[in-house]
Regions:
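Domain-level signal for soluble alpha/beta catalytic cores
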Residues: 1-211
Length: 211
């Protein structure tokens, strides 16, 4: 509990050492797993402080940018971005985990988030995790049409099958994943990657897509 800052600083330093000088390293932040209530000022302050502590540590560790990802609702995104912006102008990408219609799992939609977060100064907005690339084309297209910000798309390798052991198995192969990601690029995504179920093979398959 008291090692948050040290752990985050060390992780950034290790990552930068691993990739060398020519690759940017993003400091990663995510949901707390609990819905944020905008009417609960004390709860919001706790959330703000938690995100601010982590963001400061990532910046101190040398992160080139911050990625706020797999966010479950608009309200927690606001707390995270306001916390980061209280520290300065480091580049921030924010992606939400959504259903195929763009609805978030806690509150609001990714479209509502895009409007609010653009006003707060994020540098890119988009979606990650939750579903496969085959279910996000309309969401990406709508985001691209409503904002001038770069659109991020980092979906799962399809929808998982949960085994009796509790293990999640993703059936979408790398070539199929890349083909669907190509459609997301055509729909407006300019920053792409993968989330659950993807491996270096999947990311490698994306390199062949037209930029």
């Amino acid at each position: 509990q008291n090692e948050v800052s040290r752990i985050n600083r060390d992780l950034v330093k290790l990552s930068k050492k691993a990739v060398g000088e020519h690759i940017l390293v993003a400091g990663d932040m995510t949901t707390t797993g609990k819905p944020a209530d905008p009417e609960d000022s004390a709860g919001y302050q706790l959330l703000f402080d938690a995100y601010r502590e982590q963001a400061q540590a990532l910046i101190d560790g040398g992160a080139d940018l911050l990625g706020v990802e797999t966010m479950m609702g608009v309200n927690e995104c606001i707390a995270a971005i306001e916390a980061i912006r209280s520290l300065g102008d480091i580049a921030v990408l924010c992606t939400l985990s959504v259903q195929s219609d763009g609805k978030c799992y806690f509150d609001g939609t990714v479209f509502e988030a895009a409007e609010v977060l653009q006003a707060l100064g994020v540098d890119a907005i988009g979606v990650n995790c939750s579903t496969g690339p085959d279910q996000l084309e309309s969401v990406v297209r709508a985001l691209h049409e409503m904002t001038d910000l770069p659109i991020v798309a980092k979906p799962n390798a399809g929808m998982p099958k949960i085994l009796e052991t509790g293990e999640a198995v993703y059936s979408m192969q790398a070539d199929t994943f890349a083909a669907h990601m190509g459609q997301l690029v055509e729909a407006g995504a300019s920053l792409i990657g993968g989330c659950c179920g993807t491996t270096p093979e999947y990311i490698g398959a994306l390199r062949g897509l037209k930029r």
